[in-house]
Amino acid sequence: MVLLAGPGPEGGGTRCLSPQSPTPPRSEQTGEDPADYEEYEDFSSLPDTRSIASDDSFYPPGGEEEYGSVSAESVPEGVPEAATLLRAACANDVGLLRALVRRGPSSEEVRETDRNGRTGLIVACYHGFVDTVVALAECPHVDVNWQDSEGNTALITAAQAGHVTITNYLLNYFPGLDLERRNIFGFTALMKAAMQGRTECVRALMMAGADVQARDPRRGLSPQEWAAYTGRAEAVRVIQRLMERPCPEQFGDKYKLELPLPAEAVLKKSGSKNCLQRFTAFLRSTLTSRSSGQSLEDGGVLDHMVRMTTSLYSPAVAVVCQTVCPENPPCVGKRRLAVQEILAARGNLNAQAQDSNKVECSEPQSQILETPRASSRSPKSPAASRSTPAPVTRKASLLPLQLLRRSSVRPGVVVPRVRISKAPAPTFQPERAASKGNTKDSIYLQIPKWRYKEAKEEKRKAEEAEKKRQAEAQKEKRAPRWRKRT
């Protein structure tokens, strides 16, 4: 039996023979050089035990501990190794890595690679070090599209390994990420994720705008065909489902939370049913088996529930987070920008709008008159004085006035006034304000009077006056005539 191990285009290099029974040397029988073969007493000592060919990788075995180009044996004992970004990333030392990033490393230090051509970002994506990837996102000079000796990028490595958190972080927080970068075999990140059956990574890459119709140069298969070729049925189903419904409409600002009417309700006649028809419909709905297939169809009740709970206007989502671009939801085949690119574009638009408003507001105030100095005063001709423009626009008119008027004595921002009054004595009792009267033109607030109450009051006064007049008339009639004569 022959075992293949080590580097090579076919996944094997050195030929190793299994232990044989005590027989004469093969060199005496065949005349071959005995140095061409190596005999092993134990299979655990074979180099193939450390092979990672099962992960579809062709890195030479036995090099995970050696992170740099300099081997550990070449470093003398007692001499501490220099702390580099590559060593910190390979050891998942986030504290040291952040300290090195704050120090401001050079481009050579950031692009340091191991013997396989992998940078610290690719190694972190390979092992699934999420905190290391987050720390490297803040490091300058990081090339997210760097390819190792096999042409694999950080995105290809993370998607192939199935690290969906790192894949989403690379897609969202690394500007300039190339989704269609291929390795030496012509495979993209979506193809590698489909081959390995990483359904979550396939979904993330497709919603980020990866090309679903891309084909490799050797076999000419698409990602869906590669998933079917390698027996990844779940990946095939996910790709087919996303191609049928490419855009999640609940993530847009035009989505409505209303449940659409079913086809039966739309086709149902508007005429009213009699008692017998309603009773028949009730019996039919009762005896009919309510299977889950009707609710799991597209546009059904469960589909609407999922859309409603995950939409931007859902109470569970609107309170927790706020999307950056609600007018541009993700879609299959449409390239999605990183968060930094979206915020930069929106910040530029807001800055331009604010600058235009500030310019319009500050133009009338930014015109000043230029007065000549005392040393340069000289008689000028009327033509020269007429040709010189009087108003001169300030060069710094684009700056806000509060920044231009800032000084060490009086800043541009208006300082509020604070008045402090002495506390009164404990026995102090405030005087009640005198009543200002019920005049209508008073500046103080008054109790409102309703119109119906005023009319009722006027009617009562009129009735009292009428009764009083009638009483006086009756009194005059009852008086004797001799009193009237006098």
Curated annotation (Swiss-Prot):
Repeat (ANK) residue spans along the chain: 80-109, 116-146, 150-179, 185-214, 219-251
Listed Basic and acidic residues bias regions: 451-479
Biased composition regions of type Acidic residues, renumbered to the chain: 30-42
Residue ranges, annotated region (Disordered): 1-75, 354-394, 426-486
Modified residues (Phosphoserine): 397
Organism: Mus musculus
Domain of life: Eukaryota
Keywords from the named record: ANK repeat, Coiled coil, DNA-binding, Phosphoprotein, Repeat
Coiled-coil parts of chain: 451-479
Name the UniProt record assigns to this protein: Ankyrin repeat domain-containing protein 33B
InterPro entries the UniProt entry points to: Ankyrin_rpt, Ankyrin_rpt-contain_sf
PANTHER family on file: ANKYRIN REPEAT CONTAINING, ANKYRIN REPEAT DOMAIN-CONTAINING PROTEIN 33B
Biased composition (Low complexity): 372-394
GO molecular function, one term: DNA binding
